[in-house]
């Protein structure tokens, strides 16, 4: 999808405020919902993915199962709200051995397991909004001893709220981020 696109800096694949946030995504829902709501903490539109079973409610990008993202930027960043329920996401990458590898992170696992085609790992989320930064190049090297070439697919499962999902060429400090990539929490007035 993005193979022939010049890639530097930031490349966003989901922005909850956009006119069609799921334009390039496919949705699967069973015993749950995927809808845009206003989050009270940030007073802004977000995408809520909720379901009784994490494996049957998710969004996946690209929408066409035969297509791939072709994103070469090595950092995946997701701005996600912890709903204090089971949550998992999965990223499929291509390495320099031309092998498709999957990384699955979840908040209900306690150990990391590396198998030939999938690496599952635990993830700890803070209360409220989180910025998940995933160094795909580093994970590919540490898990498989190979080099990251590109990201093929991203799949985000229940249960979470999503503000933005993007790729970047490196990790940026809060000051370096463009305004629309920051998560603004409203200032609380502390009345006495």
From Swiss-Prot:
Task: Tell me where it resides.
Answer: Nucleus; Cytoplasm, Cytoskeleton, Microtubule organizing center, Centrosome, Centriole; Cytoplasm, Cytoskeleton, Cilium basal body; Cytoplasm, Cytoskeleton, Cilium axoneme
Q: What happens when the gene is disrupted?
A: Display curved body axis, short somite length and defective heart-looping orientation.
Cite the entry's keywords alphabetically. Answer: Cell projection, Cilium, Cytoplasm, Cytoskeleton, Microtubule, Nucleus
Function summary: Cilium- and flagellum-specific protein that plays a role in axonemal structure organization and motility. Microtubule inner protein (MIP) part of the dynein-decorated doublet microtubules (DMTs) in cilia axoneme, which is required for motile cilia beating. Involved in the regulation of the size and morphology of cilia. Required for axonemal microtubules polyglutamylation. Plays a role in cilia stability.
Q: Does the keyword field hold Nucleus? A: yes
Species classification = Eukaryota, Metazoa, Chordata, Craniata, Vertebrata
A single GO BP term for this record reads: regulation of cilium beat frequency involved in ciliary motility
Superkingdom of this protein's organism:
Eukaryota
Q: Report the PANTHER family cross-referenced here.
A: ORF PROTEIN
Q: Is Nucleus among the key words of this record? A: yes
Q: What is this protein called?
A: Cilia- and flagella-associated protein 20
Q: Where is this chain primarily localised?
A: nucleus
Q: What family does the entry list?
A: Belongs to the CFAP20 family.
GO annotations of cellular component type: axonemal microtubule; centriole; ciliary basal body; cilium; motile cilium; nucleus
């Amino acid at each position: 999808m993005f193979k022939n696109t010049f890639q530097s800096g930031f490349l966003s694949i989901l922005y909850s405020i956009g006119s069609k946030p799921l334009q390039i995504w496919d949705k699967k829902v069973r015993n749950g919902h995927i809808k845009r709501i206003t989050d009270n903490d940030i007073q802004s539109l977000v995408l809520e993915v909720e379901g009784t079973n994490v494996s049957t409610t998710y969004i996946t990008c690209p929408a066409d199962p035969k297509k791939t993202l072709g994103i070469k930027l090595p950092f995946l960043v997701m701005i996600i709200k912890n709903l204090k329920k089971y949550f998992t996401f999965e990223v499929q990458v291509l390495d320099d051995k031309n092998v498709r590898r999957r990384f699955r992170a979840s908040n209900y696992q306690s150990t990391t397991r590396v198998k030939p085609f999938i690496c599952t790992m635990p993830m700890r989320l803070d209360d409220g909004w989180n910025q998940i930064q995933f160094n795909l190049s580093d994970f590919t090297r540490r898990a498989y001893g190979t080099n990251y070439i590109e990201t093929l697919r991203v799949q985000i499962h229940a249960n979470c709220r999503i503000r933005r999902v993007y790729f970047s060429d490196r990790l940026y400090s809060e000051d370096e981020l463009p305004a629309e990539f920051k998560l603004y929490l409203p200032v609380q007035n502390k009345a006495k």
